């Protein structure tokens, strides 16, 4: 999840901790079930003294704002009283049929808080923005609750790292790679997101028994253990 601080006086964006936000979102990523026409995201104003406006919109995979498209967010702007909770509805349009139906499509959901105008002079007001990944998952590839498809990933040992193969129709975000479960969870690693049916090379030491951590649909961070046969490594299946 990305949170950006926006200075209302046109000062450039920069990343901050989400703990500073007044308007919060109930998740760090969203999966839109293609068998449904809509879904809702819960939002809340965690400030108990001041009302805030909440502005919502969708971006495409290139992080370009889309006014009309396969998925829209409503209402685009709403007022949240102090301590109040509300929701944003994501709905599909007829353009949804133009998306591939055999793999996921990537969008971004944005939520920006707009603080009330200060009555004091020379006060710089600050707005915070939350951005999360929004995956549209067509009905044809609908998954079961808690289904693990990430265990289809393949690691190929190459010079200076691994080439990760993602043969699935889903996006996979890899956040760790190491020679132990702890190293995969806590070691330094540059996060990569693999598109459906793609491969990507990452820098890493080579391990006899690699471990890989990823982000699942719920924001959890499970770890997979691999078994290698030569330079090719596949996930160790639980019996």
From Swiss-Prot:
Taxonomic superkingdom: Bacteria
Database matches in InterPro entries: Ig-like_fold, PapD-like_sf, Periplasmic_pilus_chap, Pili_assmbl_chap_C_dom_sf, Pili_assmbl_chaperone_bac, Pili_assmbl_chaperone_C, Pili_assmbl_chaperone_CS, Pili_assmbl_chaperone_N
Endpoints of the signal sequence: 1-21
GO biological process: cell wall organization; chaperone-mediated protein folding
Additional detail: PapD donates its G1 beta strand to complete the Ig fold of PapK (donor strand complementation).
Record family assignment: Belongs to the periplasmic pilus chaperone family.
The protein's name: Chaperone protein PapD
Annotated gene: papD
